[in-house]
Amino acid sequence: MAKLLRLNAIDGDMPGAGEADLFTLAPGGKAYVPFAWGSRVLGCKPPPAHGAARERGSVSLRPHQKGVLKEAWGHVTSKGYCMLKCPPGFGKTFMALELWRRLGLPALVLTNRRVLATQWRDSATRFLPDSRVFTSGTPPPDALPRDLYVTGPASLRNRRIKAKDSPAKFLLIVDEAHQLTSPVSCRVLLSVRPSHLLGLSATPMRYDDYHAALGAFFGREDSTVDRVDPRPHEVEILSTGVHIEPEFSKITGKMDWNSVIKAQSDNPERDAALADRMLLRPDVKWLVLCKRVDHVKRMAETLSSRSGKKVDVLHGSKDEWDRDAWCVVGTYSKAGTGFDACERTGLCLAADVDRYFEQCLGRLRANGGTVLDPVDDLGVLRKHSKNREAVYIAAGCTIKKTKCDASRPSQSTPTPTGSSQPAPRTRRPQR
């Protein structure tokens, strides 16, 4: 999603921040620059869109989505670009599909996971039954308005899509845009030249220099449609009693974070304590998130053996799961972001998570879900727990703090340290 500019048309510095160079040089004294940045420099407007009369399926937009779509439509048709910043479950996919329908242009969706590509295909055929969905490649020059191409950045790496190989006008949708503005993905984005651009993310932020890429490609705050949708859940913050002894680098002296995750993952007593706590809620359909694949497998075995219930796993190349299973265990990378499992009513954080936690909490799509949030005995883990607690408070969750001795699973039933109460009045845990 680049603009091709002559270098002599650029007054000032090229786009970038810190270590992030957000441009690539082209022959003839030109450069490919991020879409929104280039549009501002050129002062150009997008070409007019000619909506096609396409019939919707059985899915219709909800009132709160119509207001968001109206704002997004204004940005895309007047500037050419927009960022939809809406929480998980708000309906960003369907709003993007409706905007595509109204534009009447072929579309390309960039997403970084196959499971998300499958969800796009299924959503498109539900929402717009006449859609032709292709899960590889990019729109050719003769692509039709009903043609939707869904692909990953890896397939476009080392390619430059020439203007003559693409439609004169097409919409580019970037799903989970915060993930697709990494150093490698930015080079891919600079190889695509759409006429209209839409970014989707519940958390459009990065923790490195490439945070600047989000504004350069999708526009600043005045091009962002921002919504919140608090969903109160019942949260149990469980002090496990497990003491973590991290390792430290002999060279830098810094904590080896992998050693912390390994200590959490290689603790069968801790797994059993979590399983026993989850069994106290047999009516909840759990999603358990882990960092390591070996932990996913062991946790699934523990849950299956202690419950006698159906347990499924999600990791690696596995994209399908049993929606009737009592518990689905997956990695954060597989099931923590963009994962659409509306049937899940419980979330267990079997390994620590800090950044982008809002994405994980968003896997619970309905109000009144259950969250089991274990906290081990280590300063940085307690700090991450406080960060997650702030997210719970913002969502209006009810928080209950308990403790257990995870070294003795047979006695692992949590003991309350404070009564259940609304989040704003949550007590601090005793130290």
From Swiss-Prot:
Highest taxon above the source species: Viruses
Keyword ATP-binding among UniProt keywords: yes
Motif DEAH box: positions: 175-178
SUPFAM superfamilies xref list: P-loop containing nucleoside triphosphate hydrolases (SSF52540)
Domain named Helicase ATP-binding: residues: 73-222
Positions with a binding annotation for ATP: 86-93
EC numbers: 3.6.4.-
Keywords: ATP-binding, Helicase, Hydrolase, Nucleotide-binding
Region: Disordered, residue numbers: 403-431
Enzyme type, top EC level: hydrolase
GO molecular function per UniProt: ATP binding; DNA binding; helicase activity; hydrolase activity
Compositionally biased region (Low complexity): 407-424
Protein name as catalogued: Putative helicase 055L
Species in which this protein is naturally found: Frog virus 3 (isolate Goorha) (FV-3)
